[in-house]
């Protein structure tokens, strides 16, 4: 049944928020083997694995400057202009995110503060294969460049002829990637984490991917940093009787076309709206190019939740912690005040998720599967470190001595106490 309607019940909330997750446990063994192969075999292992999984023989993994220039010549001008406009908006938004360092006198003679420093090198995984995602390059590379990352590596699976799509190369060049490699899957993650003869290791790996990429990121975490766990895409829409059922239906269809495991949820206090949306979804599926994917997605993970009021809808949304949250109520800003958990939020009927996916400037690399409860989406801050700094004068030592000496001795760390006490005596 497409878009089943269910009544909200606080006692069933854990059941209602369930949806598809990437269960990587089943593939951890094979992925660990792939990682070991790349660690031990370097480029030769990458070639073998690329031939096995992608059916492609690759001699040179690194994309040349000549290939990038050729891509600029070949790419359709309209697509190139759209990428340029998207890049401009993404850059403007992410520059506003950049934090500043600071220093403060916390006590007389005690200056303490925080610096802002970029990560040295970052790897951006760009999904490929049957689909082309140049927008994901913009979303991963531009924030890294703005943060000041010196070396930004992109890895993406090669096409059947060994090439990388023109749009991907142009987007990477526009965004400011330092290096682009034609390698994908878990083997690309392993190469970025541990290095090969061609690909030097990086300090952090970001970007979405399939279950094997996600498992590989999980396994290399600790050797490198990663962004956050990834899973199937999802949207939750909070709507009242003032909302357009057509806009809601189209938002649901747009999300469902991503993947058979994508989740699309409407939460409303209007039964009439729920029934209208359900009918419109049914009517419009047949006009969609990806109708089979949409139908499977909505049969498995499509849902309409009826609540007593919008406050209950907000409670459900916070428990669900959606990747994308659309608010179509009479006063979306007022509804927003109660929202705590969401990856990216779209206010009002004229703010579709597609705008955030491609053009508004916000990032579309977002936490899924409830991870918005503790993760934020990719941002400029994803690529920086914040070391703390302090400078203390003799006056500051005197002001701190009671606290420092008492606690150091209480914890039995007498050398700590002496290192402090000696400075007071000198």
Swiss-Prot record:
Metabolic or biological pathway, per its Swiss-Prot or TrEMBL entry: Amino-acid biosynthesis; L-histidine biosynthesis; L-histidine from 5-phospho-alpha-D-ribose 1-diphosphate: step 9/9
Top-level taxon of origin: Archaea
Protein known as: Histidinol dehydrogenase
UniProtKB keywords: Amino-acid biosynthesis, Histidine biosynthesis, Metal-binding, NAD, Oxidoreductase, Zinc
Family: Belongs to the histidinol dehydrogenase family.
Binding site for NAD(+): 125, 187, 210
Organism, as annotated: Methanothermobacter thermautotrophicus (strain ATCC 29096 / DSM 1053 / JCM 10044 / NBRC 100330 / Delta H) (Methanobacterium thermoautotrophicum)
Residues engaged in binding substrate: 233, 255, 258, 324, 357, 411, 416
Keyword DNA repair: no
Enzyme class: oxidoreductase
């Amino acid at each position: 049944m497409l878009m089943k309607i269910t009544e909200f019940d606080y006692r069933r909330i854990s059941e209602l928020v369930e949806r598809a997750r990437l269960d990587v446990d089943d593939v951890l063994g094979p992925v660990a083997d792939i990682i070991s192969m790349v660690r031990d075999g370097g480029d030769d292992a990458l070639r073998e694995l690329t031939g096995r999984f992608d059916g492609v023989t690759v001699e040179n993994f690194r994309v040349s400057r000549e290939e990038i220039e050729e891509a600029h010549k070949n790419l359709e001008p309209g697509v190139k202009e759209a990428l340029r406009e998207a890049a401009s908006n993404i850059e403007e938004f992410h520059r506003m995110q950049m934090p500043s360092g600071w220093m403060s006198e916390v006590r007389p003679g005690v200056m303490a503060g925080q610096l802002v420093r970029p990560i040295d090198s970052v790897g951006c995984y760009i999904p490929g294969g049957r689909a082309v995602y140049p927008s994901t390059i913009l979303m991963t590379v531009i924030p890294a460049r703005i943060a000041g990352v010196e070396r930004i590596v992109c890895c993406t699976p090669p096409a059947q002829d060994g090439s990388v799509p023109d749009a991907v190369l142009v987007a990477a060049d526009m965004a400011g990637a330092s290096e682009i490699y034609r390698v994908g899957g878990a083997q690309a993650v392993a190469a970025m984490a541990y290095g090969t003869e061609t690909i030097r290791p990086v300090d952090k790996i970001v970007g979405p991917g399939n279950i094997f990429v996600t498992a590989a990121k999980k396994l290399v975490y600790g050797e490198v940093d990663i962004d956050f766990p990834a899973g199937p895409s999802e949207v939750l829409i909070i709507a009242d009787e003032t909302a357009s059922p057509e806009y809601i239906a189209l938002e649901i269809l747009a999300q469902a076309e991503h993947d058979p495991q994508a989740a699309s949820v409407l939460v409303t206090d209007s039964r009439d709206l729920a029934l209208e949306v359900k009918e419109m979804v049914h009517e419009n599926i047949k006009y969609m190019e990806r109708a089979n994917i949409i139908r499977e997605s909505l049969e498995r993970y499509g849902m309409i939740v009826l609540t007593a009021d919008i406050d209950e809808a907000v409670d459900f949304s916070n428990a669900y912690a959606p990747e994308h949250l659309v608010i179509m109520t009479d006063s979306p800003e007022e509804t927003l005040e109660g929202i705590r958990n969401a990856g990216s939020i779209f206010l009002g009927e004229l703010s579709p998720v597609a705008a955030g996916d491609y053009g508004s400037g916000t990032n579309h690399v977002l936490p899924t599967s409830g991870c918005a409860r503790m993760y934020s989406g990719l941002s400029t801050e994803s690529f920086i470190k914040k070391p703390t700094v302090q400078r203390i004068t003799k006056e500051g030592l005197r002001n701190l001595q009671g606290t420092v000496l008492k606690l150091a001795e209480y914890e039995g760390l007498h050398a700590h106490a002496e290192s402090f006490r000696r400075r007071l005596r000198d």
